[in-house]
Amino acid sequence: MPWIQLRLHSSSEHADAISDLLMDEGSVSITFEDGKDQPIFEPKLGETPLWNDTVVVALFDADFDLAPVVDMLKSLPFLGSELKYKIEQIEDKDWVREWMDSYHPIQFGKRLWICPSWREVPDPEAVNVILDPGLAFGTGTHPTTALCLEWLDSLDLAGKDIIDFGCGSGILAVAALKLGAAKATGIDIDYQAIDASRDNAQRNQVEDRLALYLPEDQPAGLKAEVLVANILAGPLRELAPLIQALVQPGGKLALSGLLKEQAAEISECYAQWFDMDQPAHKDDWSRLTGVRKSL
């Protein structure tokens, strides 16, 4: 069945209100897209992260009359004559198949591949992490995840313990285990992340070496030789005393989820505990690494 798609530009301030209005008018689904190919900005606590220029995309049944909806939008004081919109007919597709076809195996560094579970691995002799890409957590396609995976691939992890702080899908912890780490600990505030990490560990036969905790449940005195945290600048800054305490003297640290302009501030924050390296960059994003100073 075909659909009618309405696309309109909005500020992040008004996107949620427009979404609610369109749903009330009869839209069957709403999605948000980046209007200017810009990095998503970091939200305040409790806010939904959106782009400054957000495109609201609404789907309606094919026989739906959109003229009254457009008139309603034009009457809104924050849109009015400035309303920019586009209406087009969308043919129905097997969207699950379309989504699956968009994911391919990706190589990170020299040894590591991230492979969707429905694809054949390109190099059976490589270190292959089999993943089911999901909507909520890391799949390796984002520059910050890629930066962390490349860093892990560059290390000799044989026999080492690692902490994945803010583990999400568990992709970094699982990759570290497949690269030779003896044990990994994943920490996340989200129950769904814990479940996703457990599923991906089982898919890669490393579940017996991965421990997963909510922050309030992590063991007292937990420390590791390697810690990677791919979260956001705000949490990295606020949680710095907690994060540094998880790394053994001489241990290695990687921090990502940072925009380029945030790297210097976060590096300075951690320099009291770590000998920090120069940042690595990919697109608009950065990764910081360092070695824990002796106590």
From Swiss-Prot:
Residues binding S-adenosyl-L-methionine, per UniProt: T145, G166, D188, N230
UniProt-listed InterPro entries: Ribosomal_L11_MeTrfase_PrmA (IPR050078), Ribosomal_PrmA_MeTrfase (IPR004498), SAM-dependent_MTases_sf (IPR029063)
GO cellular component: cytosol
Main subcellular location: cytoplasm
GO molecular function: protein-lysine N-methyltransferase activity
Enzyme Commission number(s) of this protein: 2.1.1.-
Superkingdom assignment: Bacteria
GO biological process entries: methylation
Keywords: Cytoplasm, Methyltransferase, S-adenosyl-L-methionine, Transferase
Annotated catalysed reactions: L-lysyl-[protein] + 3 S-adenosyl-L-methionine = N(6),N(6),N(6)-trimethyl-L-lysyl-[protein] + 3 S-adenosyl-L-homocysteine + 3 H(+)
Localization in the cell: Cytoplasm
Role according to the record: Methylates ribosomal protein L11.
Family the UniProt entry places it in: Belongs to the methyltransferase superfamily. PrmA family.
Protein name as it appears in the record: Ribosomal protein L11 methyltransferase
Lineage, top ranks: Bacteria, Pseudomonadati, Pseudomonadota, Gammaproteobacteria, Alteromonadales
